[in-house]
Amino acid sequence: GKVESERNFRMGKEHGKQLSYDSDGTLRKEHNYKDGKQVGKQYTFLKGTYDLYETVYFNEEGLQDGEYSSVFTFGSPRILGSYKNGKKNGRWTTFAESGDTLMIETYLDGKEDGLHVSFANGSGVRQKEYYMKNDRKDGLYREYNLENGELRYEATYQAGRLHGKERRLIVSNRFDYWETSTYVNGRQNGPFEARYVKNDQLRECGEYKNGRRVGRWKRYTIDGKLEKEWDEN
């Protein structure tokens, strides 16, 4: 369809309201300009996978500043957040059509900084949660089972690298168990152990050096009997 537009200029620069309409008369865009820069409230009707109404504000310097929203045509929010001097700042939340929260992010000066949580669409079950600093994972990281919401993975990051303990649930056709590894600056280094979920008995133990198994390793049955003992070199 044909898009009709209305633009205003002053001294060769866009100034005042800029409007665009679809051929059926639907307002597609209402932007405000001052001396060639976008200022104040900017409204856009976005057509895509979802049709959305987007509203963003610009300051006198022509930078995004203040609340941001994109809203489904039926009125529920898709994304809510805010800008400060052209950069994302504070909490940003993404929603599903159903109204369920899909993602929560925290920003500081345009970089992800703080808690990040994602949820499964439909069930609302927490999928992942972790902390960011300067756009990199930093601190506790967790993943959950989408069926029952239980923890299935846990680790610690430092400046975007695994650093410290990592726990992983291994689902087996016999007995499920937790593996606990140790990381230093992104490499597996130090003690490793696996414990049965059912009774917390030791299943396996040994050591890693630079991502490889080294030294004496042992494996046990669920009732605590030594099943196997071997050396890794």
Residue ranges and their predicted role:
Residues 1-233:
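Glycine/tyrosine- and acidic-biased, solvent-exposed loop/turn segments at the edges of beta-strands
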